[in-house]
């Protein structure tokens, strides 16, 4: 029964190490996705510390690849030192992922206040030129999220750009995709996106942080199983000094 249990633990452990390699790629992708998306919305969110969970996720992803390599070698060779190192590193990564989850929730709660403070400034500095980074950011968000203004299109009437142009219109990025003849005129509100951008930007950023949180939780659970299997192998060897290696001279014990 004990031999069957240890063999099963090793099989699961090798399989988990292969999963760790896949997880490494997924975590790095999630972290990179956060960076890319943040670059599109950075004008609406000034707190760069929000990127910290993404940085940690990428670092954890790189470390998981190394862990998978150590785990496979240690499991196949039944190296006591290797397995102990494997468990220790997994424990460190697990604690790190718990920190990521906590930080993710902390920054997720701050998103709404951060966006509310930043978006007011961005809309005030809009000048309608493609050379201005803030203007490009607003046009990009309005097209991508299908929104107009902070709370609705009427917010544009309070901007310096609207007062200077004096043509009673909003940026063309406010035009609905289906309104082919839209010129941004407030006289035709049905051609404009009715929803404001602030709520949608908040929702988008919170969704991104939730991706990070769920990725960290999912792989933390897998790592717990990996630590359990490695501990079973280690405990078996410590209780039974005569226990043979799983693979000895090319044959299974």
Curated annotation (Swiss-Prot):
It is a multi-pass membrane protein. Keywords: Glycoprotein, Membrane, Transmembrane, Transmembrane helix. Glycans are attached at residues 127, 152, 167, 183. GO terms for cellular component: membrane. Residues 33-50, 107-212 are extracellular. It comes from the Eukaryota. It is found in: Membrane. Residues 1-11, 72-85, 234-253 are cytoplasmic. The chain crosses the membrane at residues 12-32, 51-71, 86-106, 213-233. InterPro entries: Tetraspanin/Peripherin (IPR018499), Tetraspanin_animals (IPR000301), Tetraspanin_CS (IPR018503), Tetraspanin_EC2_sf (IPR008952). Belongs to the tetraspanin (TM4SF) family. Regulates the proliferation and migration of oligodendrocytes, a process essential for normal myelination and repair. Interacts with claudin-11/CLDN11 and integrins. This is Tetraspanin-3. It comes from Mus musculus. The gene is Tspan3.
